[in-house]
């Protein structure tokens, strides 16, 4: 289950970055949103030099799964 519609359309790192920032808007409080936005930005910078297409697809898949887990975690708490 994807956290937001359109997860299956994410193919590039920039699309992933924008998708994850949109996911952050679904989080309950401003503080939590800012925390995860910062984490997304940091991860994007860390992996910005990645050029292996296979590895990029692994990162995209894992990031979407992680976003799903985080959104489900906060939905259960509310």
Swiss-Prot record:
InterPro entries referenced in this protein's UniProt entry, alphabetically: Complex1_LYR_dom, Complex1_LYR_LYRM9, Complex_I_LYR
Pfam families: Complex1_LYR
Source superkingdom: Eukaryota
PANTHER family: LYR MOTIF-CONTAINING PROTEIN 9
Family as reported in the entry's similarity comment: Belongs to the complex I LYR family. LYRM9 subfamily.
Full protein name: LYR motif-containing protein 9
Biological source species: Bos taurus
Organism ancestry: Eukaryota, Metazoa, Chordata, Craniata, Vertebrata
């Amino acid at each position: 289950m994807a956290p937001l519609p359109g997860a299956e359309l994410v193919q590039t790192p920039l699309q992933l970055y924008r998708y994850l920032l949109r996911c952050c808007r679904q989080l309950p409080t401003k503080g939590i949103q800012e925390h995860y936005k910062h984490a997304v930005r940091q991860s994007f910078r860390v992996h910005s030099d990645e050029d292996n297409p296979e590895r990029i697809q692994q990162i995209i898949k894992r990031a979407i799964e992680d976003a799903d887990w985080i959104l489900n975690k906060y939905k259960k708490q509310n």
